């Protein structure tokens, strides 16, 4: 997602430790430095977390629509590389179904906005108008492009 990295895996042994070691290697960082930023979920807790993320219940802006799209894009890439397997395929499809149900059966998406939209609204509250003021967008992602 925009403000974090989520890694999903299924298997035996200490997968969390193996993934953290791999991530540290990729980032050229020490495992100890990364550990304080890592949350690990297993079994039912992991499934619950995935469903909350997919449904945008675990995001900076409740109901943010971009997260589900990011998850689907990541799933498509992983699936194309044959990196998901039967159980993760089923789990992710279920997560997509749960997310759709949450969006259609609750009001979670009724006031959903993006982080960039929230930032612009806050700036308007502070300055009254953006006319005559300059702003700098840090980052070059899709959200920055949409707010020009």
Predicted regions located by residue number:
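A glycine-rich (often HGG/GG-containing) alpha/beta subdomain
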Residues: 1-59
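Glycine/serine-rich phosphate-binding loop and adjoining beta1-alpha1 elements at the start
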Residues: 33-131
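Glycine-rich phosphate/diphosphate-binding loop of Rossmann-like nucleotide-binding domains
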Residues: 120-148
């Amino acid at each position: 997602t925009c403000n974090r990295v989520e890694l999903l895996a299924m298997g035996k042994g200490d997968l969390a430790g193996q993934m953290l070691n791999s991530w540290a290697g990729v980032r050229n960082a020490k495992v100890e430095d990364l550990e304080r930023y890592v949350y690990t979920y297993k079994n039912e807790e992991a499934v619950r977390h995935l469903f909350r993320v997919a449904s945008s219940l675990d995001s900076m802006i409740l109901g943010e629509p971009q997260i589900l799209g990011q998850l689907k894009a990541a799933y498509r890439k992983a699936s194309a590389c044959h990196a998901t397997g039967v159980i993760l395929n089923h789990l992710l499809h279920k997560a997509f179904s749960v997310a759709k149900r949450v969006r259609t059966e609750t009001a979670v998406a009724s006031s959903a906005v993006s982080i960039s939209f929230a930032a612009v609204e806050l700036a308007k509250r502070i300055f009254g108008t953006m006319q005559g003021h300059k702003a700098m967008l840090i980052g070059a992602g899709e959200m920055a492009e949409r707010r020009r």
